[in-house]
Curated annotation (Swiss-Prot):
The lineage of its organism: Eukaryota, Metazoa, Chordata, Craniata, Vertebrata. This is WAP four-disulfide core domain protein 6A. One of its GO terms (molecular function) is serine-type endopeptidase inhibitor activity. The keyword Secreted applies. It comes from Mus musculus (Mouse). CDD domains: Kunitz_eppin (cd22611). Keywords: Disulfide bond, Protease inhibitor, Secreted, Serine protease inhibitor, Signal.
Length: 136
């Protein structure tokens, strides 16, 4: 008898489990900021301090070595290299999915995207760990 009482709760999860396109199920799950702990030699300038400071439904997340506005529906490690429009000369690292390696690039100091890490080690911890957990 008790099993039948659970049926109304189980049916939506069974249906979501069978959805072939993950984008269709996005609205059913609350996404949270990535929980990646890294040791930072230098703290980065924060892009935000609160969610409301971020545009387009992005969230203010502690990521890498500073707070960034992040689209929680995006996989950070699949984003392309983006030096941003500014003209600073900051050596940084990004994860290249095609080569499965963290590669150095020059960041201009503003905008860009979150696939932008202060060291090869942090890039590797964030993106290789994420890749390995998706295999499990």
């Amino acid at each position: 008898m008790r099993l039948w009482g659970l049926l109304p709760f189980l049916v939506p999860f069974i249906l979501l489990w069978s959805i072939q396109e993950p984008e269709l199920a996005e609205g059913f799950f609350i996404r949270t900021c990535p929980r990646v702990r890294v040791k930072c030699e230098v703290e980065e300038r924060n892009e935000c301090t609160r969610h409301r400071q971020c545009p387009n439904k992005k969230r203010c997340c502690l990521f890498s070595c500073g707070k960034k506005c992040m689209d929680l529906r995006q996989d950070v490690c699949s984003l392309p290299q983006d030096p941003g429009p500014c003209l600073a000369y900051l050596p940084r690292w990004w994860y290249n999915q095609e080569t499965d390696l963290c590669t150095e690039f020059i960041y201009g100091g503003c905008q860009g995207n979150p696939n932008n890490f202060p060291s090869e080690g942090i890039c590797t911890v964030v993106c290789k760990k994420k890749q390995m957990s998706s295999w499990i």
